[in-house]
């Protein structure tokens, strides 16, 4: 999960990384009030998860609260590379003597952590890496040993930071490592890390990417989720602990096991070529749980997508037998009632398949159509979706 700058700075403050005071807001009037509270010139900064804010007019210096009001009015609603600005950060402006760059990231290619540091900060680091690669130091970090003050100083030194700021920069670099490890991040980046005229080291900007696989031990990270940018159906699925990804097709997919669901997507897409080009509408893996509650939640999410014209349930019974899946489908349709209005093609195979098929046959719901094979089920679901368009 990528964070907004203001969220990254909240984590910086938690780990005592020095930065400038400020607050986030959604209105220009509040931006003026925050500037008045700060009592000094401020920066008005668009909060979007994309680079190039400054060039797009999303970062402005405001000498007075009235300037803050004007800039906030201009920035809110601005389109920056397809991202509409809904929030702005009002932060105290800082005098800058020099700008540096520092980041920690997961180096997947070499299966280690990596620190990157440069005396040339404040510009796109990709440009520096391409045009002047010697200016960007890359220092591997041992996952067990981590970053102590000595290594932090070495990172700063290899980044060619001035000798007079090495010690103070090392302290901040070590604290940024604490953010990286303590918050289960895959990226912590500060660009620029600045030196003020009185030799303070401040993180003026911040970019943090959190590892969603660590959410179970980071409950506080839930508050960082950008619900405005997340598809409402995906949010609804997440509330029920369903592994769901919305796609752009017309055939809803439910399966058990990521591999089977991925195969189902392919088979439905292939079948759709013969039926007006219909495509899968989603990825939904119910895992090993096919209870009535889980199935009802899954169907409720899929049927909430107005693009869905049919649903294909493709389940291979293993530990969760097909009779349990069939009972789950029956219970789900009873729970949903009239909400379930799209045809449901069901293909069961594996453990207790005959019992499962018998349960669905006895239920005899007008929307349920059974299929013997995955290919037949995909073709039927695609045909039904095409006929409804």
From Swiss-Prot:
Its cofactor is Mg(2+). Its EC number is 6.2.1.5. Binds 1 Mg(2+) ion per subunit. Gene3D superfamilies: ATP-grasp fold, A domain (3.30.1490.20), ATP-grasp fold, B domain (3.30.470.20), Succinyl-CoA synthetase domains (3.40.50.261). Mg(2+) binds at residues 191, 205. Residues 9-236 form the ATP-grasp domain. Substrate binds at residues 256, 318-320. GO terms for cellular component: cytosol; succinate-CoA ligase complex. SUPFAM superfamilies: Glutathione synthetase ATP-binding domain-like, Succinyl-CoA synthetase domains. Signal peptide: none annotated. It catalyses: succinate + ATP + CoA = succinyl-CoA + ADP + phosphate; GTP + succinate + CoA = succinyl-CoA + GDP + phosphate. HAMAP family: Succ_CoA_beta. Succinyl-CoA synthetase functions in the citric acid cycle (TCA), coupling the hydrolysis of succinyl-CoA to the synthesis of either ATP or GTP and thus represents the only step of substrate-level phosphorylation in the TCA. The beta subunit provides nucleotide specificity of the enzyme and binds the substrate succinate, while the binding sites for coenzyme A and phosphate are found in the alpha subunit. This is Succinate--CoA ligase [ADP-forming] subunit beta.
